[in-house]
Amino acid sequence: KGTFLLKEVYYRPDRVKNLKTKLNLKKIYPNMGWCDDPLSKKYNSLIKTKSNFHYEKMFRKDHKYDIIIVLDYNLKKPIPYKGSAIFIHLTKNYKSTNGCISLSKKDLLILLRLISKKTKIKIT
């Protein structure tokens, strides 16, 4: 629960072209992961996948993370076990997620055009 800024957008440049948004765009490469290991000092942040700690792969075979928006949840001075990798990402079927928000590619592309660095999302 809470109200969160939308921080930045990560995307797969080999699968997605010409994104239109006012948020910062960052490319996803094969060596990128998001640390979800509460024992790591890098908890809830982008890391290289050669880490000894557990992480979620950003460069995936499926299309789930072809485009993601990072929510400002537990990012500054992350508290272990409070939650990590809270994203808005792609889905085909709008099924529930493990704490994220999932949208169709069409809807996510529309959202990207409408949001700015001041946009907040309220999760209830």
List where the protein language model places each region.
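Cell wall/extracellular polymer interaction/catalysis modules
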Residues: 1-98, 108-124
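Extended catalytic/binding region for NAD+/ADP-ribose chemistry, centered on the ART fold
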Residues: 99-103
